[in-house]
Amino acid sequence: MSSSDIFDVLNIKQKSRSPTNGQVSVPSSSAANRPKPQVTGMQRELFNLLGENQPPVVIKSGNNFKEKMLSTSKPSPWSFVEFKANNSVTLRHWVKGSKELIGDTPKESPYSKFNQHLSIPSFTKEEYEAFMNENEGTQKSVESEKNHNENFTNEKKDESKNSWSFEEIEYLFNLCKKYDLRWFLIFDRYSYNNSRTLEDLKEKFYYTCRNYFKASDPSNPLLSSLNFSAEKEIERKKYLQRLLSRSAAEIAEEEALVVESKKFEMAAKRTLAERESLLRLLDSPHSDQTITQYLTSQGMSQLYNALLADKTRKRKHDLNIPENPWMKQQQQFAQHRQLQQLNVKKSEVKENLSPKKTKRQRQEMQTALKRKSESAYAEQLLKDFNSDERKALGVITHGEKLSPGVYLRSTKLSTFKPALQNKILAILQELSLPSRPVMPSFDVMERQEELLKKINTLIDLKKHVDKYEAGMSITK
């Protein structure tokens, strides 16, 4: 496939090489003599496909090496000179500049300002004996006031402290200066007395420093930071060793205990919050006045409005506003009076309109009057019988309204909520009693009802006692 075929496929018009309209294109001499540029990085056949179109990117052939840096400035000289790393060591390094400008004398290192050391106290043998004897005298006066056992242990400690010589203490302080209180290095390099432990070295160093500063200035604030106890340090290391030598099961058990403790803390906080809310609700309004002002209806209304308007207490405001009990009682009294007045009016109207009643209404009224008279007659008859005679005759007066039809007495037992009902049934099983009596007579049902009420009361009391004991254990 040639380039002309590809141009035809792509619908590109190729310039005709034959003359058109009698015009002949005469190539110039410069164009003819111009050499064609050699294309690199592209195949010749692919480049021929471009035809007379210019390529989108100028392709230039050139080397990929960096050009030589051309600089007219003279290079600055560098000198290999000496410098003092410290007072005993002299090293050499390269410095920009000639030797004439720098000089022959070695200069200090610019990093010497960062080479800081701790200020360890130094003293002579006379000074050491002076402040140590002074401190031991004050310590003996304090120890005389303590018990015999404490004195015995302190004497042992003093003997161990007095076994240190001045030369050994001086050797210890020199090591502390040399290694800047890096105690593991000090303990590793310590060769004066191999029986000393790391805690002994620390304790003796801080004990001597505390006596030194105390003799010069008793009110020095550094004295409180120089207290070191070797026994506590040993206990701390033992505890850390036990902590790091735990097994995976022990770690999991401790994590479970931590989770349980957090649960107990949350429950304790919740219980305290509930107790605070209850105490806040039971808290009466603070007033210097007597209670007699709240005995009237006007005083009760004022108290009710004051409690509603009290927004300073941190309590949850319910959307349902509580009813005023005094107003509710007044409404009940008013309704009762209205009903009485209506009944009186109805009786008067009935008496006046009695001839206008229908036959059915008259019969219903007669049956009602008959029942009323029968119940009154029955009560009058039962007045002459005592409780034993009533029980023998089986006569019972029902105060509540009985449901029509036949029913079982066991179905009239009072029921409770499911959770409370399960607790009551569990207690009845512990007492070896059935949930329903086998012989549900009237007396048995009464006793069963009383038993259920007492069990309910005991469960409620146990709940309050457990809550109170939990609160007491939390407050302790």
UniProtKB/Swiss-Prot annotation:
Residues 142-157 have a biased composition (Basic and acidic residues). Keywords: Acetylation, Activator, Chromatin regulator, DNA damage, DNA repair, Nucleus, Transcription, Transcription regulation. Pfam families: SANT_DAMP1_like. InterPro entries: DAMP1_SANT-like, Homeodomain-like_sf, SANT/Myb, Swc4/Dmap1. GO terms for cellular component: chromatin; NuA4 histone acetyltransferase complex; nucleus; Swr1 complex. Component of the SWR1 complex which mediates the ATP-dependent exchange of histone H2A for the H2A variant HZT1 leading to transcriptional regulation of selected genes by chromatin remodeling. Component of the NuA4 histone acetyltransferase complex which is involved in transcriptional activation of selected genes principally by acetylation of nucleosomal histone H4 and H2A. The NuA4 complex is also involved in DNA repair. Present with 2230 molecules/cell in log phase SD medium. This is SWR1-complex protein 4. It comes from Saccharomyces cerevisiae (strain ATCC 204508 / S288c). The gene is SWC4.
